[in-house]
Amino acid sequence: MKIHEYQAKEVLRKYGVVTPRGIPCFSVDEAVKAAEELGGKIWVVKAQIHAGGRGKGGGVKLGKSLDEVRTLAGQILGMQLVTHQTGPEGQKVRRLLIEEGADIKKEYYVAALTDRATQKVAMMASSEGGMDIEEVAHNTPEKIIKVFVDPLAGLTDAQAIELAKGIGVPEASIPQAVDTFKKLYTCYMETDASLAEINPLILEGNGNIKALDAKFNFDSNALFRHPEIVAYRDLDEEDADEIEASKFDLAYISLDGNIGCLVNGAGLAMATMDTIKLFGAEPANFLDVGGGATTEKVTEAFKIMLKNPKVKGILVNIFGGIMKCDTIATGVVAAAKEVNLSVPLVVRMKGTNEDLGKKILAESGLPIISADTMAEAATKIVAEVK
């Protein structure tokens, strides 16, 4: 689960991390009022969407008068903001953050994250703040410092000092940086985040350290422990089909291809998508029905896939372990009839009650194409949609 920047800063402030003063707004008048309340001579008008690259996309502007704040807020609020993370369709800006200006002397990057390659908790920092960290990792990997943290010991002073010195924090500001790093790590652990990122972390002209921007990703499986985090959820920022799928315990992610995929098990689902790509087509979605799929779940899965106008065919790939093939077959037949399926459907199933499942499909009277292997299934569905 993702949250907005202003919400991320609220979370950080609860742990003692210093951020600029800011006020979230939902209208132009609120934006002007917020600037008046904050005072000063310069304000930052920031679009709030669940995507990075907002500045490059025109979603972050400086206002040097209240009239300018009003103009900028009017331009940004309601715009379809396109960044490298939103895709070409962009995301609509429905809320703003009006923030006091900052005297930026230097920008850094710091994050606490789950390092999948090593299966460890890591603290990562760079002297190249304010940039896309993936870009830095690709072009100048030597400018990224990473330390691995023992969860039982936590981030030690020595590790935090190593990070601060490694990214060039001035000696006088190292104690503040160390304090910020340790608070960020504690926040990351206690909120069950998979990523807690400050980018940029700034050094001000007076030597103070502040979190100028922040981003969190939270482990959705741990949200039951954090109702205060769940309260931050903004459904407007999420895919409507993904929200609908979650109501039926379906793991669904929309993609850009034209072949719908319905699979049981995340690993098999990813292998299925890879196989589709291998045979020259693109998957339209990731969809894992899990090990306890019912006829209702399968029907809803079909409905969700077919909402996407780009879907020209569907591939069902089932391994019958916990899930019985005849159960899936019954669900597939019922779903195809209920939605009046009009696109090609290829079904490949192996495992428990496989023969019974194939019999149900064969006797359904529907034009369902059977396959025995993943390669055969992919070949057939790709041929059907071309």
Curated annotation (Swiss-Prot):
Transmembrane annotation, as ranges: none
UniProt keyword Transcription, yes or no: no
One Gene Ontology term, aspect cellular component: succinate-CoA ligase complex
Keywords attached to this entry: ATP-binding, Ligase, Magnesium, Metal-binding, Nucleotide-binding, Tricarboxylic acid cycle
Co-factor binding comment: Binds 1 Mg(2+) ion per subunit.
PROSITE patterns per the UniProt record, alphabetical: ATP_GRASP, SUCCINYL_COA_LIG_3
Domain spans labelled ATP-grasp: 9-244
Cofactor: Mg(2+)
GO molecular function: ATP binding; magnesium ion binding; succinate-CoA ligase (ADP-forming) activity; succinate-CoA ligase (GDP-forming) activity
Binding site for ATP: K46, G53, R54, G55, E99, A102, E107
Its EC number(s): 6.2.1.5
Swiss-Prot/TrEMBL catalytic activity: succinate + ATP + CoA = succinyl-CoA + ADP + phosphate; GTP + succinate + CoA = succinyl-CoA + GDP + phosphate
Pathway(s) of this molecule: Carbohydrate metabolism; tricarboxylic acid cycle; succinate from succinyl-CoA (ligase route): step 1/1
Presence of the UniProt keyword Metal-binding in the record: yes
Superkingdom as given in the UniProt entry: Bacteria
UniProt-annotated binding residues for substrate: N264, G321, I322, M323
Binding site for Mg(2+): N199, D213
Subunit structure: Heterotetramer of two alpha and two beta subunits.
Similarity remark: Belongs to the succinate/malate CoA ligase beta subunit family.
Protein name as annotated: Succinate--CoA ligase [ADP-forming] subunit beta
Organism for this UniProt entry: Azoarcus sp. (strain BH72)
